[in-house]
Structures are given as C-alpha cells and as structure tokens.
Amino acid sequence: MGPKKNSKFQEVSGSKPVGNVSIRFEKQLGQDDEEMYDTTAQSKFVLKNLRHYTVHPNMAKYYEPLKPTKLQRFLTQKKKMNSFMLKVTEYDQDMTLLLMTNNPPPCSISQEKDGAPIYFPPEFQLKETLHRCKPNKNDFFPTMSQKKKLKPELKPVFPMKRLDDPTFKGQQWFRFSTDNDFNIEGKYSEIYALRKQKKMYPNLIFAPASQRETKKHVSMKSESETPTSQVFWEPLTFSKLLEEKPTRSVPGESFFRHGRAQQWIVKDAAVIW
C-alpha cells in the first residue's frame, strides 16, 4: 500500500487548489528512508469549531488587583493609629520634659501663702507639719526650727511681686522663664534630627558626638590655618604655559618634535632574531 500511496501523491505536484482551500504537500523522509508527504492547509471546519475543543483560560482575573480583605483593612488601620499615637506620645514626652525643665513645679512644703495651699488641701499641710515637728527619741541634738528646715539650701529663691499690691514682698522657689535664661545654643532640634535619621536608616553606624565635635573642630582649625594668597589670578595663555613648562628638545627631526611628521623615520635600526 505504501508504493501506491506514494505514486498517488506524486501525481499531485507542488500545490493544488481544492475548491477554495489551498493544500500544500511537503516531502519528508520517514523510517527506512521512505518518502512521506504531509498536507498543511487551513480548514474552515477547524477555525469555525476551534472553540469547542480548545481550552481558553480566563486571564482577566490575573490582571485585576487583589482587593484587601476585611482583616487586612482592619490591621492596616490599626497600624496607622498605633503609629500616629506613638508619634504624638513622643512629642508629648519631649514637650513635657522641656516644660518641666524650664518651669519646675512648686515644692509641697512651701510656707508661702500662694504656694502649697493651691495644690494641697489644708488638712494635708497640717498633718505634714505635725509629722515634721514631732520629736524623735533617738535625737540627742536640739531640733532645728521649722523655718530653718524649710528654707531651701540648694534651690534658688526668687522674689515674688503682685500687680495689685506693689508693696508686697514675697519669695517663691519657681518662676516663669524669660529670654535671658536661654543663652545656650539649643540641642533639641539636632538630637531630634539625629534620632529621626537613625529610625530611617537603622543599618548605618553613626559616629559618637565626641568624634563629630573633634572632626568639626579640626575642619574649622584647618580652614583658619590655610593662608590666604594675595597673588592676583590671571587668565591662562599659551605664553604663560610655555614659561611654566618650556618645550624640551627630544631626539628626532624638528617636524617630528612639533607633531607634524607624516611618518616616523628610523635611521639606525637593528633586527633581532
């Protein structure tokens, strides 16, 4: 049957139109060097019914962005709230520390009229006074007067004035800060910037403050020690360049020295084998 099939295909040479379909025969070698012909052509049946036996996956879902779930939205919102609360807490801590440093609260044992009674009730003041005035059996020395006990030794005492009574003279252990108190350069913004930089770049190694200060002083010292030249600068010209670096004579012809030689002429050459 093989030879008959080959002879049948040999009768149809090249390509032959069958109706409206163009069929092309391709010659191939099969097993045992047997010639075989393959037909490749477009079939209307295949194109028309291709969708019935071809799997078309729905690729649209792979291009749609995944929508966050309810749990993910809740966790994201919780994370934002915690971050905001942490920033507010840090800011409040810094501001509270600054206020407490500049304006310390009054002492609870102050004897002034406008001091402790504002913050503590009279019953508390009476109990505290009786407790302090009670003598101790183990003390063999005479007790110090209450007025001397309450007098501050380390804390400064500031004069107190009243707007309604100019003749009033009093003392207090605290006062509001003024512009004259801030004579030192502020370090709060620098420390805050360094802290923020450490949070942004946790893998970086920052030099200690002492090393940064020494580098700063060394750079300032080097800048101050550099002598300032009084020589007036002039534009660079070819004559000035020749004065600084004159033309040197080199072996060879004159044209070669000035770079106008078309070819190198070697008078004495030795060939080494």
UniProtKB/Swiss-Prot annotation:
* Name the UniProt record assigns to this protein: Testis-specific gene 13 protein
Q: Which Pfam families does this chain map to? A: TSGA13
InterPro entries from the UniProt entry = TSGA13 (IPR029241)
Entry superkingdom: Eukaryota
